[in-house]
């Protein structure tokens, strides 16, 4: 399946999911190119509506492989141009119609404490995976902010699909 969304923003409004099987070998870009061909007529119908949701002058549309069961995490970063560090993360997965309803702050320390307290093996495994990913995302956000010379506060956004995370955008 393919998700179409306005590059210029829109806060999730106007996004469309198109059914297009993506079972091709090769890079993600090649997969998207091959998957879009069968649905080209349908694309024309939805592009104008998706473009209309974009803010500013950028009316371009992004097509990406849709991840069905997804969580949305944000990491706050701060830098002065010479260094960059993280200020913690927020789970923004509670959404309705692609709009955040609730943001829950979570720290590495809180996850570690929850792992120690739980007696449920399945819950423990999930928490351990979450802790590992949160640490990785914080390290990546700090490295990325430092690499671009971040001289302010920013948000490093990721999506999580089971045990993998993917950089989405930095605001």
Show where each model-derived region lies.
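A conserved helix-loop-beta module that forms one wall/lid of the active-site cleft
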Residues: 1-15
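Short beta-strand-to-turn element immediately C-terminal to the catalytic PLP-Schiff-base lysine
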Residues: 16-21, 78-80, 87, 104-106, ...
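Bilobed periplasmic-binding protein-like "clamshell/Venus-flytrap" ligand-binding domains
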Residues: 152
């Amino acid at each position: 399946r393919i998700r179409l969304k306005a590059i210029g923003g829109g806060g999730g409004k106007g996004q469309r999911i198109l059914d297009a099987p993506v079972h091709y070998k090769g890079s993600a870009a090649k997969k998207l190119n091959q998957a879009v061909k069968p649905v080209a007529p349908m694309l024309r119908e939805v592009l104008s509506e998706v473009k209309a949701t974009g803010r500013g002058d950028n009316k371009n549309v992004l097509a990406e492989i849709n991840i069905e069961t997804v969580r949305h995490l944000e990491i706050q970063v701060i830098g002065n141009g010479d260094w960059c560090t993280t200020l913690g993360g927020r789970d923004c997965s509670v959404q309705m119609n692609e709009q955040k309803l609730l943001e829950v702050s979570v720290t590495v320390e809180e996850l570690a404490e929850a792992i120690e307290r739980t007696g449920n093996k399945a819950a423990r495994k999930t928490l351990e995976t979450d802790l590992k990913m949160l640490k990785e995302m914080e390290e990546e956000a700090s490295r990325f902010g430092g690499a671009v010379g971040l001289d302010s506060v920013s948000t490093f956004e990721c999506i999580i699909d089971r045990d993998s995370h993917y950089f989405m955008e930095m605001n």
